[in-house]
Amino acid sequence: MRDFRFWLRAIGGLWGACLLSGCLGVNPTMDMLTTFLPGKEPALMVAKGYEYLLIEIDGRKTAMALGARQEVIGAGDVMVHEHWYSGQREMIHMVNGRIYTALGLTVEWRRQQSSPPIWASLAASQVPVTWQREIDVMPGYRFGQTDRIETQVGSAPFGAPAQAGGTQWFVDHVRSPQPLGGDWVYKQHFAVHQGRVVYSEQCLSPNVCFKFKHLGLVQ
């Protein structure tokens, strides 16, 4: 019930801000996500006392509000599930900082089955870790698409913001089959501080790539 009341207050405020601003832009995904008055710098209209995720796509910024956070323990590892909502009620579900599902956007991941390596184990590994994720992608009814991923300790990508001391960077090398044939090969980057992803660069498709930064609790 508390999560539901939070969602009504935080998302309601963001949705109202979106209506005031007109939600106009160039990128269709940004049009759907926009929750602030137009401009490159985020004039964020957010509610105090709640946690937000800053999102950048094509150089424009917006915010999503945390609707729920849950820790699930499996095989001795803690999996942190977070559900982030925009002012237009789009939702991005992240697990340990990685996009797991995304609904209401121009590209949706409706289901995922994967077992990505835990950040702590990656930090201790001297070699890349190879794994797979199976996702259902819309539009196009691409059910069971299998991406092959190699993850390893890395360095900050060009243009990434400075991070606190002790932050460790990781990089994904992703090979994703495309509907017209061939593979889309790209990188994803994650900054992990005290076991938590505080900044990342991730993609849903070749045309929908995000930069995520945790804003924390807005006072």
Predicted region positions:
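C-terminal motif of bacterial Sec signal peptides marking the signal peptidase cleavage site
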Residues: L19-G22
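Generic surface-pattern signal
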Residues: G13-G16, A124
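Acidic, serine/threonine-rich low-complexity disordered tracts
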Residues: L24-T101, T106-R111, S125-Q219
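Bacterial N-terminal signal peptides that target proteins for export
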Residues: R2-L14
